[in-house]
A protein has these predicted regions:
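Sec-dependent signal peptide recognition
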Residues: 2-10
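Hydrophobic h-region of N-terminal signal peptides that target proteins for export
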Residues: 10-19
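Short, structured beta-strand/loop micro-motifs enriched in basic residues and often containing a Trp
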Residues: 35-45, 87-95
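A generic structural signal for residues embedded in beta-strands
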Residues: 62, 108-111
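Short, Lys/Arg- and Gly-enriched loop/turn segments at beta-strand edges
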Residues: 67-79, 116-127
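Intrinsically disordered, low-complexity linker/loop segments enriched in Gly/Pro
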Residues: 115-179
């Protein structure tokens, strides 16, 4: 199941460096889609500019999008979608990147996930593409209502799937010598 997440993490370099700032750095969540959002990327590459900066130990709020960027962010979801305009042109949007002050290539960063807030809706689709299209007869789309405990859908009455929200990708950008 694909989910919209609002992720709050705390990042620090694994050295004795401390932040005096308590202000939360907010990354992503602007623009109609990832292409219009300066806090959204869809690949990991050293030429991507570091738009956001944070001190070691400072909290960062990532306003993330679903895997194909059709539902918007948690804050923009207002009503359950009846259909989805699925376009695989700009898949896998990620919030970021964030420069951690004092970090240099090769440093190990410690990330503590403080909270994951699921969006109101998620979806599952299959058939006609994806990972195992030859094992699925026909196409389907199921929209799920999400909360912290479970997901449920009118398409599969009586079924509740336990919510196991996760952040997706947490990574550092590669250096030019790592391409």
């Amino acid at each position: 199941m694909f989910k919209i997440l609002k992720l709050v993490i705390c990042v620090s370099i694994v050295t004795p460096v401390f932040s005096a700032e308590n202000e939360i750095v907010i990354v992503g969540g602007t623009g109609e889609n990832c292409i219009e959002d300066p806090g959204c990327i869809n690949r990991l590459h050293p030429d991507i500019p570091m738009i956001h900066r944070a001190n070691p130990g400072q909290s960062i709020l990532f306003r993330t999008r679903d895997t194909i960027d059709v539902l918007g962010t948690v804050e923009t979801q207002t009503s359950e979608p009846e259909t989805l305009d699925i376009n695989f042109g700009a898949v896998h949007p990620m919030a970021g990147p964030v420069y951690i002050k004092g970090a240099i290539p090769g440093d190990v960063l410690k990330v503590t996930i403080l909270n994951i807030d699921p969006g109101k809706y998620g979806f599952t689709f299959g058939g006609g593409g994806g990972f195992i299209p030859d094992l699925i007869d026909g196409e389907f789309l199921t929209v799920w209502r999400l909360n912290r405990e479970f997901a449920e859908s009118d398409d599969i009455a009586g079924v509740r799937i336990p919510n196991a929200s996760f952040p997706g990708v947490i990574s550092t950008l590669p250096g030019p010598d790592q391409l």
